[in-house]
Amino acid sequence: MNLQALIEDIRQQVLPFYDQGRVADYIPALASVPPHQFGIAIHTLDGREHACGDADTPFSIQSISKAFMLALTLQADGEQLWRHVGKEPSGNPFNSLVQLEYEHGIPRNPFINAGALVVTDRAIGHFGDAHARLLAWLREETGNAGLMADQAIAASERAHGDRNAALAHFMKSYGNLGHPVETVLDQYFHNCSIAMSCRELARAGLFLANHGLSPQTGTQYLSRSQAKQVNAVMLTCGTYDAAGEFAYRVGLPVKSGVGGGLLAVIPGKMAIAAWSPQLDARGNSVLGLEALDRFTTRTGLSIF
């Protein structure tokens, strides 16, 4: 199968979907991103790379960082982590307070904002500077020593992060955050503000397709069981309240971010990253979903 020709053809098929979504505007620094961009990149376990479009343009990975933070923290915390955060889909918006109150400060899963704040808090307990640890890992996996958080986006998120602050204070009141709220928020916002390209993101995510083992560095980041767990939570919770649609149309573990990125995993084969900044009503990339749908439909590569 000629994957390069396939993704180039898919790119042409999805470009007409421009303007069927809108760029995230609740974070002002994201609102200024030019909307008509699309990139896709594939990294396979046997070392092949395919990319087209704007695959080398860095973008804010936003909530995709939560998948990497979950992996880092699960490696350090083990099963203890699941006493502080659940594994179930929420069915609510990613920044909802309602469910958190009903469930006494235990977030439903690690990928809604409340859950990611708890994971960050647990990571701080193990690494001190969890953001620095995440950056070091991503730099090693991508080979980009200059990979950084976008400070303008981090500052913009902090200035407009009252809902996240409310979530953190609420969980703190239930004893489910062990560190100062400001410390947790600062590291969380900086994680979300990391800028990566599709090529880099697919390369960094490849360990999830390889039972937790990085093909690039030979590092075993997760046990086989833990890699299965992360992929499972990505499948059921990784695209917020659109997880059912993604499972139906794409059939892969996927993590999305409001920067317009998507990271998809085909266990035993490859990782795929797609990016286009215009989002649907649920906060997922319009063109990214269309591209992944076409890719799995035409290749037959899904977990189902």
UniProtKB/Swiss-Prot annotation:
Pfam families: Glutaminase (PF04960). Substrate binds at residues 63, 113, 157, 164, 188, 240, 258. It catalyses: L-glutamine + H2O = L-glutamate + NH4(+). Keywords: Hydrolase. Its EC number is 3.5.1.2. GO terms for molecular function: glutaminase activity. It comes from the Bacteria. One of its GO terms (biological process) is glutamine catabolic process. Belongs to the glutaminase family. Homotetramer. NCBIfam families: Gln_ase, PRK00971.1-1, PRK00971.1-2. This is Glutaminase. It comes from Chromobacterium violaceum (strain ATCC 12472 / DSM 30191 / JCM 1249 / CCUG 213 / NBRC 12614 / NCIMB 9131 / NCTC 9757 / MK).
